[in-house]
C-alpha cells in the first residue's frame, strides 16, 4: 500500500522565510502542483499579514494565524478562539507598565495596534 502525504503545515518566521523574509523560490508552484495535499500556514502573525504574502494562492491554503486564535480557509472562519474581555484587560494592564510595548489586539477582520494605550488605568478603556 502506497502512503501519500495528505497535509503539510509550515511556520513562517524562522522556518519558511529566509533571513531576508523571502519565501523559497517555487513555493507557490509546488503548492499548486499538489492539489490533493492540504497546505497549512501556521503563524503567530495576523491573518491579513499572511494573506498579503500568499494572496495569489490563498484559496489553496488553510491559515492558522494569531498563534492559533483564528483559523481561516477560503476566506471563511473555520475556528476562532476569542480572548475574554477580562483576560484582555488583564494583559493590557500588565503591558501598560512598559512604555516600550505596544500591544496588538487581533480581531477577525482587523488588528489594532495600541499606540495610545497610555491612560493611568487601562480599565478606563473599552476592549470592544
Residue ranges and their predicted role:
Residues 11, 66, 128:
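Conserved residues at the C-terminal ends of beta-strands
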Residues 6, 45, 123-125:
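Basic side chains
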Residues 2-4:
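Short, small/polar residue-rich loop motifs at catalytic or cofactor-binding pockets
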